[in-house]
Amino acid sequence: MILLALMGKPMFALAIPLAVIVAFLLLNPRLTFWLLLISLFVYAPQRIGTTFAVHPFDLVMGLLYAGIVLEYLLKFKQGLKFSPFDAPFIILLLATVISMVFAYNISYAIVPCIRIFVIYLAFRAVYSYGQIIGVRKIINVYLWLVALNGAYNITLFIWQGGQERVFGPAYLGYETFSMTALPMAAAFMLWAQSTRQRILYGGLAIMIGLGIVATQARGPLLAVAIAVPLLIFFAARKSKRESNRSRGHLLRLIFIPAVALIALVFLLKDSLFVGLFSRYEEMLVSLTNPKGTIALRLILWETAIRTFLDNPITGIGIGNFRLVHHIYPDLKLMPLHWWIFGMSAHNVLLHYLAETGIVGFLALVTLSLKGLRHSYRGFMQKLSQPDNQAAAALFIAMVVFCVTILFMRAWTWGQGGYVMALLFGLLAASRETREIKQLQ
């Protein structure tokens, strides 16, 4: 390798260790799985043309699936197990393909269609390795990764005196990570086996919450504000049913870290968190007098419904909502018209209703409701403490998914797509693992 470099062939010299690393990852797909999870927290897209970008996690995903296929062939495995989520995923994929064929601009539809296929492959990978590695272990690592990103966010936010919003290395992906991970950490805290564990997961929840504060993002905070009370309600219901824990005890466990976080923010509201409170105040005012992003969402939702009514079967094509101002030129006359260009519908259901028509919409609704139903059933079963942690975490994360598809920017592309695959894959793996235990 050194000789090649000295001979004036540095590219060949670099290619050798790179080839060794790739070969090692191909032969060790379990390690590649962990690398994929870590790479989700690095937002570093490389643009190829005007409509395509490759992310580090996409490259790792390619290596993971190549390794899975290689392992499958070398071990001569036969048959594939299917979960309750495979059918709606496949129907959603078919709907996107059909919408691509009839798209307003097919060049904008190719990449989003590939994205759905990649999400499905990621779901299958998580489903498989969730059973091998363990669902609880994967969730635990996920919580730590989100908390570390949150720690980076709040540290840099304080360092800058609260002057700028900080998202960290995950960039906007932190919104999806944080709004799922904080309630999951709260679930782990509720069913912790020791005081040490309660302090640990309570600390992780606070760190993730501080990370949200540093971003000043309103969507994740709203999601958490909905999810945590629901978690307490269903936890109390489960505890009463199993007669093993009082409601007051559950409330105290959540109450302490929640009050600590809220008190800290309010203590510094006139200094470090001035910008944060002004953004949230603007959101509350917009509920009665829509303006800013609230008004924009109303316009986008109305436009999505209008688009569906004109194209009910195939939609305007996956990935084509960003061109909706070309389809309806009158949108350019609206006050917030400039912000419509290149936007999603900021409602995943309406977005897919507009882009893929009724079939894609129903597939996504079915997938969401199946996820919620299966997660609730798993959560309400009488389980061991560690299994309770995983089941409760998946249930509340699925609640967050079902709620936020109504108002968040994206769930089916970028890092959000991989988190979606992670949640459904872990849920399928958890269900499969419980069924195997029951048979034994």
State the predicted function of each range:
Residues 1, 17-22, 65, 90-101, ...:
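Alpha-helical transmembrane segments of multi-pass inner-membrane proteins
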Residues 1-97, 129-140, 190-199, 243-253, ...:
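Transmembrane signal-anchor hairpin modules in multi-pass inner-membrane enzymes, especially those
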Residues 7-8, 25-28, 210-217, 353-356, ...:
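Transmembrane helix irregularities
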Residues 7-11, 51-60, 111-113, 167-181, ...:
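Membrane-interface micro-motifs in multi-pass membrane enzymes
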Residues 228-229, 367-370, 392-440:
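Transmembrane alpha-helices of multi-pass inner-membrane enzymes
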Residues 242-250, 264-303, 323, 340:
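Flexible juxtamembrane loops connecting transmembrane helices in multi-pass membrane enzymes
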Residues 287-302, 314-356:
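Long extracytoplasmic/lumenal interhelical loops at the membrane interface
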Residues 357-368:
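Hydrophobic alpha-helical transmembrane segments
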